[in-house]
């Protein structure tokens, strides 16, 4: 029954009741006084179903949504949340939020707007999010790539080093100069892991390779990324990987007739001749799972509540591998994927040497997540020094 038909029924019912009361009154007036008419009950009101208010979910991004990389991947996942839950959620985002003191203002503003679940998508939001969370106990917070948690703040990450390893497998096969290059963003464990993993993947196919690194100390700065990529090419690198957010590295490789990989998102379109494959992150499975927990009242935070998803969970992949990549490299990538999914393969299994030649992992020793979370040095085969590290 539509709302209009409900209103018409109530109008009809009300009119009929009044008519019935009038007739009863007339009959009482003509009959015995002791036979008063029994009171007529008013019609029951139609049951009103109250629709639950949608869950308000907000995202804070360090870069623009159109960066083609990191932020683009997060925003695609936000859209996937909307598609999954429909009118049960309302999402919003703020882009280009700097990793600085002003980030706290942004998070407090998101709280003030009534958001119930807030995602901060870069490492530098850690302290601003923690401060805001401690003052906003009725709001749920999730911080990407961080490590500090509290009762209403938990952390999550993707095993991007798995994508870096697969890129290394391809790079080790494709290089002619045996020199690979990486444009690094911020020298934190997350990025250092990726550089080392890229080197290990390359060494698995070509023990002669060496890896050079140029740091730009920013996540998104296309001019700096371009300059760094050109510097690596000038230094002999013929295959590049990046841990930055724009497509500048791939575009620079294309202009120079070299090879490169997409990072975080599929970047094929930005340099189709240079593109060997893209190490992508799919944040959608995690965001959908987290929002579902919040909707179902099962969302839990606290010390140790950290999710770290990779190939196994469908969060990491190597996609759009170029046709020029040889069959044996393609097969090696697929073997790595299968091993990561079923746990039969570990990237961080000894014997592995640090850059200075000292043993880091003994034979068959496997670095656990705690060790990987604090890595601040290069492995053997990576040149240069980690800024502020070893």
Describe each model-derived feature in a short phrase:
Residues 4-6:
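Residues that mark the N-terminal boundary/hinge immediately upstream of a DNA-recognition element
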Residues 13-18:
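Sec-dependent signal peptide hydrophobic core
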Residues 26-29:
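C-terminal motif of bacterial Sec signal peptides marking the signal peptidase cleavage site
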Residues 32-390:
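A residue-level marker of the well-folded mature domains of exported/periplasmic proteins
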């Amino acid at each position: 029954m539509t709302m209009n038909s409900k209103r018409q029924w109530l109008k009809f019912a009300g009119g009929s009741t009044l008519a019935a009361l009038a007739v009863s009154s007339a009959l009482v007036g003509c009959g015995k006084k002791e036979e008063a008419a029994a009171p007529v009950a008013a019609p029951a009101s139609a049951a009103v179903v109250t629709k639950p208010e949608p869950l308000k979910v907000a995202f804070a991004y360090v870069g623009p949504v159109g960066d083609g990389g990191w932020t683009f991947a997060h925003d695609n996942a936000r859209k996937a949340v909307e598609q999954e839950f429909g009118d049960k959620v309302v999402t919003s985002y703020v882009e280009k939020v700097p990793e600085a003191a002003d980030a706290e203002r942004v998070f407090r503003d998101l709280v003030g707007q009534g958001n119930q679940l807030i995602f901060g998508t870069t490492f530098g939001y850690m302290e601003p999010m923690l401060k805001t969370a401690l003052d906003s106990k009725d709001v749920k917070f999730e911080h990407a790539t961080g490590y500090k948690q509290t009762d209403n703040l938990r952390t999550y990450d993707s095993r991007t080093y798995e994508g870096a390893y697969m890129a290394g497998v391809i790079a080790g096969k494709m290089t002619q100069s045996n020199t690979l290059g990486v444009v690094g963003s911020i020298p934190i464990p997350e990025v250092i892991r990726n550089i080392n993993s890229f080197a290990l993947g390359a060494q698995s196919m070509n023990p002669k390779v060496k890896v050079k690194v140029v740091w730009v100390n920013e996540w998104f700065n296309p001019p700096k990324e371009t300059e760094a990529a050109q510097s690596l090419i000038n230094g002999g690198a013929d295959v590049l990987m990046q841990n930055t957010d724009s497509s500048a590295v791939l575009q620079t490789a294309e202009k120079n007739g070299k090879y490169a990989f997409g990072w975080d998102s599929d970047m094929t379109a930005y340099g189709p001749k240079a593109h060997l494959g893209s190490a992508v992150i799919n944040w959608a499975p995690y965001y959908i799972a987290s929002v579902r927990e919040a909707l179902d009242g099962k969302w839990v935070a606290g010390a140790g509540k950290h999710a770290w998803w990779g190939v196994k969970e469908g969060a990491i992949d190597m996609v759009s591998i170029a046709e020029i990549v040889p069959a044996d490299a393609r097969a090696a990538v697929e073997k790595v994927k299968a091993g990561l999914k079923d746990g039969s393969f570990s990237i961080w299994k000894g014997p592995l040497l640090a850059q200075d030649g000292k043993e880091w992992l003994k034979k068959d020793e496997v670095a656990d997540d705690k060790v990987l979370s604090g890595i601040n040095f290069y492995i053997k085969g990576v040149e240069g020094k980690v800024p502020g590290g070893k």
